[in-house]
Amino acid sequence: MSVKLGPAGVPLSCKGRTIVEGMDDIISLGLETMEVQTVRMVAPQHFEQYWQAGVLAYKADFEMNIHGPYYSELLGDRLQRNRSLAKIEAALQAAKTINARHVTLHAGHYGDMSRGQAANEQVASVFKGIVQRIRDIWNDDEEIYPVFPWLKDGTPAKIGVETSGRQELWGSLEEVLEVVNHVEGTIPVLNLAHIHARGHGRLRTSEDYGELFDQVRETIGTKQFYCHFSGVEHRMGNAMHYTQIKKSDLNFEPLAEFIIEEGSWLDMTLISDSPLLEHDAMYMVQNIERARHRQLERKAREDRRKALAAQANITPEEMEAREIQVAEARAKDALANVQPAPVESEEAVEGETAEPEKKEEAVEEKTVESDKKPAKKATKKEEDNDDLFAVEEDDDDIF
């Protein structure tokens, strides 16, 4: 099993914004791949840093990948298709310069065509031309081998056909698999967030992921997978936007469990499309490690059970049944040892609550009585002195 993880673009934590600086940060995090984004355009000034990144990837055995333009119209009219192919040509040249192993592309809207065989044949025809073009670029000129040493082995980048996230876009899982099955040199790019959204939240358990990868393996007979993963907000079978993994109903834990428990045959590159990029890539690494630890703990328990069963001359299944019985007995004993608090009758409770109320009423009555006690009768001398300063209310009218 081989699983390489990395972000889609330069890490957010990278102080510099060049690809080489991003690669340094990714390698320092222990990640093994990245996907360079050329989603809108490839400018000539970019090729210098692309070449530097390609040299670093070649020396460090680091897997580089590239994402072509998002807005392709491969099913549009001839003008739209030629514009899209011009952008794809720039992405292919960048892939050669950067030593990319995969080039991810979209087909775009259906245009005037509808879903079905005709649209799939049109897409397949275009991708056959793209595959031939990447081969020509890779084997263009032997004189440039000293500058691009990774071209010597003669293995061009794979052309990836990505699953789309919306119903109006070509790229359902079945459409992608049909095209890839008929075009040599292409691979399916399983955008798991898109597949989850188009399936109305279909990827929820490790069994769901198992069915997905088995479907791909049985259809095109591959063990190599190139996947994107991210959280996603979706409605009515359409992906709205990417989210961080923890804020989505698309959980990574079931995929990690599938990779460890049943994915020993996988050769997978897994790209984090999350807005958190390398942070969620590290989150995926941690979940895979946790799944691996759980597997080791389970195997250790099974080995111990087999050893005890052999000593007791019984089967491991019988030993497991005994362990369950012992655990249940211990749970019952623990419940029995817990002394429940005595339950008092309602009348006693009412009596207890009434007594404090009576005490409070008695205290209130005492305070009222004390307030009502007449003050000490003043002496005649004190009354006369008080009269000296007594002022009737009517005197205020004088002023």
Regions found by a protein language model. Give the residues of each.
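Gly/Pro-rich active-site loop or hairpin
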Residues: 16, 114-117, 170-173, 196-267
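Hydrophobic faces of well-ordered beta-strands that scaffold small-molecule active sites
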Residues: 3-9, 34-36, 64-68, 103-105, ...
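Active-site acidic/histidine proton-transfer and metal-coordination neighborhood
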Residues: 59, 74-189
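C-terminal helical cap(s) of enzyme catalytic domains, especially alpha/beta-barrels
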Residues: 278-291
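Acidic (Asp/Glu)-rich catalytic clusters
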Residues: 23-28, 45-65, 93-97, 132-135, ...
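N-terminal pre-domain/capping segments
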Residues: 1-93, 187, 294-340, 345, ...
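Active-site beta-loop-alpha junctions enriched in small/polar residues
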Residues: 8-12, 37-41, 69-71, 108-110, ...
